[in-house]
Regions:
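Envelope-exposed proteins and targeting segments
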Residues: 38-41, 73, 109-114, 127-132
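Solvent-exposed coil/turn segments that connect beta secondary-structure elements
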Residues: 47-49, 82-83, 118-121, 132-141
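Bacterial N-terminal signal peptides that target proteins for export
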Residues: 1-9
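Bacterial N-terminal signal peptides
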Residues: 8-18
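Solvent-exposed loop/turn segments connecting transmembrane beta-strands
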Residues: 53, 120-126
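C-terminal/domain-edge helix-coil "capping" segments
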Residues: 20-38, 124, 128, 137-235
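N-terminal segment of the mature soluble domain
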Residues: 52-117, 155-161, 168, 220-229
Length: 235
């Protein structure tokens, strides 16, 4: 009887040790770096929702983009709520011109304003999201003694007015449909190091929770934006 109990205890201990040694480990995600050696400060405006889906909340989407930007070495990011306060003070519903963006940058004291746009948003498996990032870099448009709200009014495009050429404007665009095998593989690769490998969903959680999938989308667009030669030249 004692021998039987000892055998059972030994087997239990061995199984426990085996479970401990085979526990999956977290992966490591690659880092993102702002080109150049000097730090910059960027601000994120509320997203422009063109998807027609109310679930794509402009403030939440901006916060998700803000979280991704914070992981970029060499970059300081102003919280979204501060940007919202400035937009309200300047009576701007959404940025409509490079001149308006420059005024906002001057008020916030930042180097650039990043405006996300949502063009498609389907949170159901397989998720799909279309988005673009518009980076407006600061220019010297402020006039001493002039109310910033008056400058904003002057910088607002008139109806049917053509948009002038933009010298300090960068844009990246993408459609991320998880029904596409390469997109799905990229999302799962992004999830490595960002999920609990012992959790119920593991990396697949990024294909189930839309906020996580949105993070993948913004991360991909930021990576593309940071590779723009014009961004490096501006340094």
């Amino acid at each position: 009887m004692m021998r039987s109990i000892t055998t059972i205890l030994t087997a239990t201990i061995l199984l426990s040790l085996s479970a401990c040694t085979s526990k999956p480990e977290y992966g490591s995600e690659p880092s993102m770096f702002l080109p150049g050696s000097a730090r910059q400060t960027w601000a994120v405006a509320p997203a422009v929702n063109l998807s027609g889906v109310a679930q794509a909340d402009p403030i939440l989407q901006a916060d998700l983009l803000f979280s991704q930007l914070q992981q970029t070495a060499g970059l300081n990011v102003i919280p979204v709520n501060r940007v919202v306060e400035v937009l309200a003070a300047l009576r701007i519903e959404q940025v409509q011109s490079e001149e308006q963006a420059a005024i906002i940058c001057n008020v916030l004291g930042c180097d650039a304003l990043l405006v996300p746009t949502i063009t498609a948003y389907d949170p159901y498996d397989p998720p799909k999201m279309g988005a673009s990032l518009h980076l407006f870099r600061k220019t010297n448009v402020m006039n001493a003694g002039v109310d910033p709200r008056e400058l904003v009014r002057r910088a607002t495009p008139k109806p049917n007015e053509s948009t002038p050429a933009r010298s300090s404007f960068l844009q990246v665009v993408g459609m991320f449909d998880a029904a596409n095998g390469s997109t799905r593989a990229a999302a799962l690769l992004y999830a490595q190091g960002r999920n609990d490998p012992a959790g119920p969903y593991g990396a697949k959680g990024y294909l189930i929770e839309m906020d996580r999938y949105s993070g993948f989308v913004y991360h991909s667009l930021i990576e593309e934006l940071l590779l723009k030669p014009a961004l490096a030249d501006a340094r």
